[in-house]
Every structure is written in structure tokens, then in C-alpha cells.
Amino acid sequence: MYEIKLKNLTKSFGSLNAVDDITFTIPKSSVTVLLGPSGCGKTTLMRMIAGLETPTTGSIFFDDTEVTRVPTKRRNLGMVFQYPVIYRGTSVRRNLELPLLTEKLPSEEINKRVNDVAELLGISGDLNKMVEELDNGTRQKIAVGRAVARQPQIILFDEPITNIDITAKLELKRSLKEVFSRLSQTIIYVTHDQTEAMTLADQIALMKDGVITQCAPPKEIYEKPKSQFAGWFLGNPGINFVEKEHIGQSGTGITSSLFTQSIEAGSKAVKVKALGVRAEAIEVKTKQVPDSQTAHVLRKSLGIGGQYLLDLEYGSLKVKARVPHQLGREIGKKVWTTIKSSDIILFDENGVAI
């Protein structure tokens, strides 16, 4: 399968650089998710890899072969779009067969591929049904099956589960996770949904304003965001930011009203703009203990899937904490917090992690 290498890739529309000088490698047989808000350039980047857009400058390589201006049909890739491409008035089996018939494969090979893909996607029982009988989630599985059955080197997914209902979305996400674990193709998946990215990716390329701000495995990019943007965009809720008005700095030591210990910034020259801490990293106690901070006021408690999301207030400082059980504390009463130094991330004046 192909390794994909992008070198100084730029796509301009007038004065706007939708993709701005990206150099980036996608390992072969990996699942790479291009994640970011609407308008960040992720779909434009995918379309250039597919050959549907021509770069303004820069190069694209599949392994060591440059394909920057090679037509899409010669790139040996499959695509699954937001709106499934299916043939109405035909059966599921026929929809899966058609791309293979154009390649003039033997009928035995076509039947084998169709049956294998249907089993992989859990739609074997639907093969003889007309596509009009199926829900949107199953129709999107057909679109996935059509791309997989061709056995291309690369498969591109452009927000494939955005326009289906929540139940079908969860089922399709589970199916895609299973499919991806069993495929050897290089997969590129575009989404604005962080939950999809965290569930499906081997690596996430987080995009903003046409550039990749961080590329790392999901766990790393969540626990060690390299920017305030990454900390805010990944997580529900996003990371708590304590801005400089709540931070004290003396030499390399950093203190805050959120915690008792002093954190080392590493250099006196570094000016700390903000610090970040995840909601689940804040331990909340109903009684004060020696290592806990001055009392916060509990303002809200919301049960979510067996956990509780708390809104805490310390003067003008407001943070969210996630705890595994109900506190048994009335709203408006005091609670105390503890945070490990290793869970605190410092950000400089440019919003970059120190």
C-alpha cells in the first residue's frame, strides 16, 4: 500500500490560501484523520490527494512516484463521500458488483469480493434487497463496500457519517472501526467531529486556517496538545484555560489560584499566557485535606453517562471538573480541588505549549 508524502503543498483561491504550505507524511496502511472546523482546508487537502483539485504549488508523492498532476482514475484510490453514491432501482448486490464489472474481473472473483465485503460490513442479509428498502446508514455501508471491493491502494472518506441519524451514525462508526482494523489500505478520513477522529484514527492531523497545527496519535494529541487551539478543539468539554490574570510568575516558577504547588516554566525568558488542565484531571473533594486548594463553589452538577460534569467557581475563575460519582454536595456549597503538576500544561504568549 502507498505511503503518501505531501511537500510544501499550497492551494490558493484568489488571495486565500485554503491549504498553506503543508509538508506531511501519511504512513502506508494507516488511518489518518484530517480533523478541524469548517473552512480549515481539510476537504481541499483531501481533494488534492485524490486528484480532484490541482495544487497551486507543491508536490504529492505515492511512495516515491510523484502524482501531483496524475489524473484521479490513474491514482488507484477509492472514495466515499458525505452523500452516498448508489444506483437506485437495483439490488445491494448489483451496487457492489458494478465497479468490479467495469474492471472486467472474472465472475467468480466478483462474487467472492462482494460476499466478503458484505460479510465485513454486516449486510450479507441485505444483498438481494433493493436499495430503496434500506435506511441511510445501510446505504452508506454500500458506498463503503463499493470502495473496499475494488481493493485500491488508498481509500478516502469525506465526512461519510455526517448526514445520518444518531442511531445509524453509532452503528456505522462501529462498523468502520472494524473495517479499518481489517484493511491494509492507506485510509484518509475527513471530519469535523472529534469523537469520530478519536475513535477511528491511528493519527490525527489537526488543521486550522489551512495548516496542520499538530499531528499525533489520538491519545497523545488529547493529553499533550501543542497549542491552546488543540486543547480547546479536542475534548468535551474542551480543556480548562486559566488566563494570565489568575497566574503568578516569579522567575521560572508558576503559581495559580487553581492549585497550591509551583510549576516550573523551564526558562525565565518564557512568559506564560495561560495554563490548561483537563476536566478529568481535577480531583474534587467535599472536605479540605492538606494538599487541596482554597474552596471553590459548586455551581452546577450534570450527570453524563455515569459520570458528573461540575461547574466550579473561585472568584472570577470558572472551571469544569469531571468526576466518576455524584458528590452529594448541594449547589452553592464549597468543594476543594487537587491537581497533579504533571496534568498542568503551560502555554506561552503565542498560545503554544511550553
Language model segments and positions:
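Conserved ABC transporter NBD signature motif
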Residues: 58-66
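Non-catalytic connector elements of ABC transporters
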Residues: 237, 249-354
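Conserved coupling/switch loops of ABC nucleotide-binding domains, chiefly the family-specific signature
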Residues: 56-59, 209
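Helix-to-loop junction immediately C-terminal to a conserved catalytic motif
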Residues: 50
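ABC ATPase nucleotide-binding domains
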Residues: 76, 82, 86-229
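The feature captures the beta-strand-to-loop junction immediately N-terminal to the Walker
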Residues: 35-37
